[in-house]
Amino acid sequence: MNTLSQTQQSKKSGALPLLALAISAFGIGTTEFVPVGLLSSLADDLNISITLAGLLISGYAMGVAFGAPVLTALTSKMSRKSLLMLLMVIFIVGNSVAALSTSFGLLLIARIITAFSHGIFFSIGATIAADLVPEDKRASAIALMFTGLTVATVTGVPLGTFIGQAFGWRATFWGVALLGVIAIIASALLVPKNLKEAPPAKFSDQLKILKNGPLLLSFAITALGYGGTFVAYTYLAPILEKLTGYAPSAVSILLLVYGVAVAIGNTIGGKAANKNPLKALFWMFLIQAVILVILSFTASFKVAGTITIFAMGLLAFMNVSGLQVLVVNLAEKYVPSAVNVASALNIAAFNVGIAIGSFVGGLIVDSIGLVHTPWIGGVMVLGAVLLTAWSRSIEAKAK
């Protein structure tokens, strides 16, 4: 009887709190990328250009990039459950303001406010998930939490796009705010109060990392390799409508197909990067660069364009786990006192990449046209290929 009671208690203290974290991750993942499917309707309704609407993605990314390391350090002394609840309040407020926005300026501010909750959530969420389970199940617990992000890409973004097309883009943001309400209730009820508190993050630890060459190189690889795809992905809906020739009503279905490709790629990428992340990343980036270049030539053809876009999705997020493992491995080797801070800074690097990619994509759309976004994104990813080769050379010499 006692063993059964302990098993039930273990499930309560592990699986259910992880579900609450996954719900939060699903909401955050949905709000980050859902504007991709709504760019055209947002631009038309607010009477702005597609390029300006693209700032809703790059602006959000910069909010995460600057907010993650700075706010993680500033809030390090707060109780982790209290901080988790505060982050979801910010998330709800940000999306509610977005839904009420009548101007582009207010909508952009709302997006940046929402972004502040993103970076810190994934910084503390991973450590909370790890502490909820036995040590030999920590990796699985963290993976379960991040499943919320994958599910958001597969279902949240296409569903949000469908809702936006059927009822207007404001309805999508109200729906995401409702997700935040569900997440905060789940966190309040299911996440335990007696969480082990992590040691405070220090700005001095961030400075140590920023002085380390191999880690700085890995952040540059993250920004270029992950961000290059966003030169085209940010404008995927206009590409599908204006180049490939799909009706706006078909975009949500195609984003669902893209999301399935992302989910498959995530699974493959995690397994491929287990033994030698640098080698795996080199080949992932090289193939992705080639696919992006090909897309510029196939985008105007429905069948070939759709197949190439699916392939782009397959590779787009395949590198994420490898990039995270690479940074953690390097931090443990060079700056062992600041592994968590290095992980937070890599989240910032991901979002710097998104911001750069989205911004560059906007410049291309305005200057030489939508069809050129994929191959220029491919050039950006090719930069990551070269940096990865350099990093492999450095690590080989260090052995």
Task: Map each language-model feature to its residues.
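Helix-breaking motifs and short loop linkers at transmembrane-helix boundaries and internal kinks
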Residues: 47, 79, 100-106, 117, ...
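Extracytoplasmic
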Residues: 17-50, 68, 232-237
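Intracellular juxtamembrane helix-capping segments at the cytosolic ends
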Residues: 121-133, 318-334
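Paired small-residue
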Residues: 90-97, 102-114, 303-311
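A late C-terminal transmembrane helix in Major Facilitator Superfamily
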Residues: 330-368
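Helix-to-loop junctions at the C-terminal end of transmembrane segments
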Residues: 68-79, 265-277, 365
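Helix-loop-helix hairpin linking two adjacent transmembrane segments in secondary transporters
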Residues: 102-106, 121, 134-195, 222-225, ...
